[in-house]
Amino acid sequence: MVALSSNGYFSPDDYLELESRSDVKHEYIDGQIYAMAGTGGIHNIISGNFYMALRSRLQNSGCRVYFADLKVKLKEGRRFYYPDLLVTCDERDAPSQAFVNFPRVIIEVLSESTEGFDRGKKFQDYRTLPSLWAYILVNAQQYLVECFQRTPQDFWLLKSYEGLEAIADIEALNLAIPLAEIYATLNLPALVDEVGMETDLT
């Protein structure tokens, strides 16, 4: 991510106003606004596959799945992030809002440039959301999905699913999705050997 300005402070309201008129997505961290670069093809296919898998399973559940363009509000408005996908089952998260306050599940498709942030500081911030039950990381270099599930004791339990034969159990939504569905149409080993790991900045 690249800071929009290294000088001065933007209030949350400043950020939301600027973002409503911007053609480029930005994240907001403690008064600074950071531009986000576009994603690559592998990233988009994985995100789209996961969105379709969730949407088809959640249609009559009262939960909604959002894809890429909806922010999550954190730290009482001091931070706003754009996850690749999120699911909210809280009626207070109206579809007309520009951001979600009560996500149940957040999903990030990993890229080489942001994997450290997604696993580290961003996950640390997401864990402050009482509504969040699961944080899911999807690898774009190999067939691997990591599900971090919050326990009743407020610990986070990791379950990893590897290989196209595996089925990811998303307990927070009471559903399971085969990795073959998440990675549909992708031959990752061949693609990674050909072009290397994608370097988008989402």
From Swiss-Prot:
It comes from the Bacteria. This is Uncharacterized protein sll0925. It holds the Pfam family Uma2. It comes from Synechocystis sp. (strain ATCC 27184 / PCC 6803 / Kazusa). SUPFAM superfamilies: Restriction endonuclease-like. PANTHER family: GLR1098 PROTEIN, RESTRICTION ENDONUCLEASE DOMAIN-CONTAINING PROTEIN-RELATED. Disulfide bonds: none annotated. To Synechocystis PCC 6803 sll1609 and sll0925. InterPro entries: Nuclease_put_TT1808, Restrct_endonuc-II-like, Uma2. The lineage of its organism: Bacteria, Bacillati, Cyanobacteriota, Cyanophyceae, Synechococcales.
